[in-house]
Structure formats: C-alpha cells, structure tokens
C-alpha cells in the first residue's frame, strides 16, 4: 500500500475508532486524559513530516509506521481509561451496596452472574497488561474484550438498581430480626436462670 493510502487509513481509524472512544472517555470521566493529548500530537506530527519537502520514500514510510504505532497507542490508552472508569463504577456499586443482600436480586441469579463478570473483567485486564509489552495488537484485543465485559457488568448493575432499595430494606429487616432474637434469647436465658436459681 502506498503512503497516501496508509495515511488515509490512519485518518479513517482516527475518525471511526478513536474519536468515538475519546468521546466515551470524556463522557465518563468529564476530562480529556493528558496521555491522549500527547499521543494525538505525536500522530499528527509524524503525518505532517510525511509532507516535508525532500523526504525520501523510505523516510515517509518510517514516519507512517511511527504514526500507525501512535494510533494503536491511542486506542490502548482509551481502553485503559474506559476500563478504569468502569472498574470505578463497579467499586462504587459495591460501596453503596455493602449492607445489601445481593443474593436476593433477580431471584438469586444476579450475584453469581455479577461475580463471574467482575472476575472475568479483572482477569482480562491483567492478561492485557502482561501482553502489552510483548504484543500490542493482542493486548489491544484483550483491553477491548475487557471493555465489553465491563460494559455487560455495568448493564447488569443498571438492571438491578431499582431492586437494590428493596434488598436494602430486606437486609435491614433481617438484621433487626437477628438483634431482636439475640435480645429475646438473652432475656429468656436470664429469666430461666433466675427461675432455676429459685428452684434449687
């Protein structure tokens, strides 16, 4: 493929893949991550060098290759930011529901699926981090897979949000019943011990 077609392919990737990812990062984090600025600047810098007067075809090819690596790096950084943001969403859910019996949601089907997806997402991110130093394309696929799993997990969490209040009430009632039973058993054992003391 000649240089112009490769540059067009780079801009096509930028417009169809990177821009939507950046928009999602901005929507989730309400900021534009600094590493993305640097990578985007470097991408455009290498493309601009392709048009320097007097550059040989070999030099242009080298600059395009560097730009292609920056495109992959931008996608990696976007998926890392998105996975981190989604993980924070999961942690917030866990913090908000730490006093909730999650096993009763969706007739008991929510919690096993939740734990499975959470574990799968975390393990996939770990594998991607290990792969990143050896094979960036494979790491990119793993980060994308992790993003999809986290997205499924977030949808699952969103589906139970209305039921969490009911589960919280149930948990509170169960806890109150445990306390009342403990108090009743303490009072009963006190009465029985007084009664037995009077008998003997």
What would you call each of these model-derived segments?
Residues 1-54:
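Leu/Val/Ala/Ile-rich N-terminal alpha-helices, chiefly Sec-type signal peptides and the beginnings
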Residues 20-24, 49-63, 95-102:
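Short, charged/polar, low-complexity loop and linker segments
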Residues 50, 74-82, 152-160:
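Amphipathic alpha-helical coiled-coil segments
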Residues 68-119:
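Membrane-proximal low-complexity regions enriched in glycine and acidic/polar residues
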Residues 165-200:
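Hydrophobic, helix-forming membrane-interacting segments
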């Amino acid at each position: 493929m000649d240089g112009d077609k490769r540059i067009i392919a780079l801009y096509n990737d930028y417009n169809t893949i990177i821009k939507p990812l950046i928009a999602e990062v901005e929507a989730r984090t309400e900021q534009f991550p600094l590493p993305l600025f640097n990578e985007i600047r470097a991408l455009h810098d290498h493309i601009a060098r392709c048009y320097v007067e007097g550059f040989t075809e070999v030099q242009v090819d080298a600059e395009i290759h560097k730009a292609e690596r920056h495109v992959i790096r931008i996608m990696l950084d976007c998926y890392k930011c998105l996975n981190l943001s989604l993980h924070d969403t999961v942690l917030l859910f866990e913090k908000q529901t730490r006093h909730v019996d999650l096993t009763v949601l969706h007739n008991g089907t929510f919690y096993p699926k939740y734990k499975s997806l959470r574990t799968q997402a975390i393990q996939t991110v770990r594998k991607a981090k290990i792969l990143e130093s050896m094979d960036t394309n494979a790491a990119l696929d793993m980060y994308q897979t992790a993003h999809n799993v986290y997205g499924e997990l977030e949808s699952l969490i969103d589906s139970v949000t209305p039921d969490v209040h009911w589960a919280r009430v149930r948990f509170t009632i169960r806890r109150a019943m445990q306390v009342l039973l403990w108090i009743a058993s303490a009072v009963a054992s006190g009465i029985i011990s007084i009664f037995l003391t009077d008998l003997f």
